[in-house]
Amino acid sequence: MEFVQEYSDEEAAAIEREFTRLKDKHYLDHGGATLYAESQIQAVHDLLTANMFGNPHTSHQTGQLMDEVRRRVLRFFNTDSSEYSLIFTSGATASLKMVAENFTFRAADSAEGDEGAFVYLRDNHTSVLGMRAIVGTSRIHPLERENFVRHLKVSARSSQRKPSLVVFPAQNNFNAAKYPLELIEEIRENGLVGYDDDKFYVCLDVASFVSTNFLDLDRYKPDFVCMSFYKIFGYPTGLGALLIRKGSEDLLDKKYYGGGTIQIVMSGKNLHRKHVKPSDCFEDGTQPFLSIIALLEGFNTIQRLIPPSNGYRSMERVSKHVFNLAKYCYHQLGELVHANGAKVIHFYMDSRFESRDRQGGIVTFNVLKDDGSYVGYAEFARIALKHAVYLRAGCFCNSGTCQRQLKLSDEGLLEYFKMGKICGDDNDMIDGHPTGTVRAAFGYMTKPENVDRLVEMIRERFVSQGISRPVKPTNRSSNDEELELKAIYIYPIRSCGSFTVTTSWPMVDRGLKHDREFSIVNSNGTPLSQSKHTDMASIVPKIDPRSNVLILTHPTMPDLILNLNKLPTAKSTILPEDSVDCGDEIAAWISKALRQPRLRLAKHLNDGNHSPPPKILMINGNALRSLGDEDSAEDQATASWLVEHFQGNLVVEAPATVDMQTWKQVAIGEHRFKVVGMCTRCPMIYVDPASGKVSADSLKAIANVFKKKVPLGMYLAYVGDGGATARSLQCGGRFILEQKDHSKVTSITESVVRFNFNG
């Protein structure tokens, strides 16, 4: 199908001039954040440099301009201060949290324990799910998408008296499915089936919706509206709003009070009186007044670039534009097929783009190979990035829709967690099943050429043309065909260097003993990663198991030797519950080595259940060597060097022609491992472990690996040793693998049936 153009040629050209910085970049993550226009930022600069804006508690000029912004926001949503109060927050998440913290679930005359209900749609953002942790009621219930409309009652009951709250999104941020906003008044008037005594109020998450749609609060009137401004304008970030319907503010019982929110307060006697006006009562302290003022230029930019036309408001025209783009993308992707006729794209949509009333400007999908297996979303996103196509991959902080679309139960999700899968990681495949998806989200400045580039990239990189790469002949003897564990690499400190073991290494319940047992954290308790701090590779830890000491080396530092039996293990408020601080001596050494102040070393306790065990990466050395010329000493040296780049734990010798993607479980001696995903090739592999730098040689060698598309490694989860007395993993012996067809092999030809993987 052809793209249906909403903008005139002049409007499209004017918009393109605002985003010259994009050049050949194709930005398709407007669901995460849209982009700011160049003239918008220039106008903000001019406004700030031409005026002196002081604290609004002092400056009358600043306060007046902030009030003008409030009126502008309300007018943008077709309402005014007689219908809604506006409270500035740090974003939609903070707005949702404010409602959750302060909503009163008990009527004034109700008995103790006689409380209302908190009901939420499962297809909500994580920030809504987080409300469950702090709402003032124990009656917390989820609703499935397909049951949502059915739960509406036919008529109201006179017994409705318990204040209750229902939360749902105007538009699903996962795939832009829209919910009928007519439900708002129906729920307020009629309630929900099974909640006869509950008087429901509606909290509407519009963060995704208002980014590319017009929200008409004169027509649809939820009690609470939560939003972020950067989703609409790109700038400023860190600013959102909570809009409260008049009359509903009485349901919020605010406890804390900060500067500027009280009429009187006594420092001795515990007495205070809050302001009555919601914006004065709820906006604690000094608001980000410069960011608030900057919103004016966001509104001006949208109205200037996309003026109302043919009876449609600016944001209604944006809605038409992104819907047309998404529909065009949906059909273009849907037409892709492999040479054998198999579909290339699996969609995760709740509509087929029949109506703009029910669908917004997002297309969510995964790529399929010609055999029907999936391309991992993380691998896809990285390849797309190499082609300057910027997308979002994962579950987009919407586990409810992600589970529903991937057909993953709560029990299945928990099983993935036990295998090491956590939110935000790159573990995109488990047992051949995707753990997330790819999202293309469109904004007002997106062009059809951006969609064309996405489709072209998929056609170039993922669509099979029926030409297979011949298998390279091998000169290895049959003895070399056996599967053998050659070496073990231990990484005591996450994102730092490793040491090699060629004999044996002890195993514990969580896997390899001491592997990723420590993390370097900053003053906020956030772990450092080599992907952002490449010089972490220069710190090489080694553990001597006989004396139980940790030895740290660095090119510019004297070695530091720490006795693990006497290591300080103090609890710290900045660290997770299952971690302890390792003391000042090692903290000072690490801070000096990395040239960053106030770093600490955290030790992760093995007896907690707060975090999953680290995944074990198995690398096939033969597969790496197969990438180059067998007779080239340089190529084979590069292959050995790449083993360290991939930061594998177990280096095995398996035939390069073996398809590791068919492996299901592995047994090495008495120790069993479950395959939980293929190597996702994270950015840390570009870092030279010897120098801690991203070198040209690294990029060249690894680009060659990716180009040949050879599966080089897989992630394993340690299952156990079946109660065996020997707790060490031995190098040098053969191992047994179970393939997905349930066959078990120790070499290419020899079948083995003696090992029981079920214990």
Swiss-Prot record:
Residues 591-738 form the MOSC domain. Its EC number is 2.8.1.9. Keywords: Molybdenum cofactor biosynthesis, Pyridoxal phosphate, Transferase. Gene3D superfamilies: Aspartate Aminotransferase, domain 1, Type I PLP-dependent aspartate aminotransferase-like (Major domain). GO terms for biological process: Mo-molybdopterin cofactor biosynthetic process; molybdopterin cofactor metabolic process. The active site is at residue 397. It catalyses: Mo-molybdopterin + L-cysteine + AH2 = thio-Mo-molybdopterin + L-alanine + A + H2O. Its cofactor is pyridoxal 5'-phosphate. The modification N6-(pyridoxal phosphate)lysine is found at residue 231. SUPFAM superfamilies: MOSC N-terminal domain-like, PLP-dependent transferases. InterPro entries: Aminotrans_V_dom (IPR000192), MoCF_Sase_C (IPR005302), MoCo_sulfurase (IPR028886), MOCOS_middle (IPR005303), PyrdxlP-dep_Trfase (IPR015424), PyrdxlP-dep_Trfase_major (IPR015421), PyrdxlP-dep_Trfase_small (IPR015422). It holds the Pfam family MOSC. Transmembrane segments: none annotated. GO terms for molecular function: lyase activity; molybdenum cofactor sulfurtransferase activity; molybdenum ion binding; pyridoxal phosphate binding. The keyword Repeat does not apply. It comes from the Eukaryota. The keyword Transferase applies. HAMAP family: MOCOS. Sulfurates the molybdenum cofactor. Sulfation of molybdenum is essential for xanthine dehydrogenase (XDH) and aldehyde oxidase (ADO) enzymes in which molybdenum cofactor is liganded by 1 oxygen and 1 sulfur atom in active form. Belongs to the class-V pyridoxal-phosphate-dependent aminotransferase family. MOCOS subfamily. This is Molybdenum cofactor sulfurase 1. It comes from Culex quinquefasciatus. The lineage of its organism: Eukaryota, Metazoa, Ecdysozoa, Arthropoda, Hexapoda.
